[in-house]
């Protein structure tokens, strides 16, 4: 009888070890799958802005060298999934003053004010062919047909990804 008990214990141990091994394998597989999904849920951003764009304050800025009229400047930005720059805060104004050398077409926000610059707008953008031009630290009303440089702006890749997928 004692030999029979040893055989039963041996079979039970073998069965238990097999079940534990399979459970460990299943848990390990689940761990690998979850880790991979988590890892790939957060893309690797080697660059948050495209080549030739400058990153600042969660946005990317593109300063053109070629000059175009205001309408073509707006179209150029649209083609690059961006928009003509607007000065919605003093930080953006200071950034462009520091890096943008020359005159650039700008857009204006709906309340038609630019922080840090005191001036009055008596016109609507694009009406009567008058548009806004930023020159170092001044805003100038200018005919939209003149050719000037452009600054396009868009969210950086990380900010865009975060607002798309994490909220």
From Swiss-Prot:
PANTHER family: C-TYPE LECTIN DOMAIN FAMILY 2 MEMBER D (PTHR45710:SF35), C-TYPE LECTIN DOMAIN-CONTAINING PROTEIN 180 (PTHR45710)
Gene3D superfamilies, sorted: Mannose-Binding Protein A, subunit A
All copies of domain C-type lectin, residue ranges: 49-152
Keywords of the record: Disulfide bond, Lectin
Superkingdom of source: Viruses
Cystines in this chain: 77-152, 131-144
GO terms for MF: carbohydrate binding
Signal peptide positions (record): none
Protein name: Putative C-type lectin protein FPV008/FPV253
Keyword presence, Mitochondrion: no
Disulfide bond in keyword set: yes
Coiled coil: none
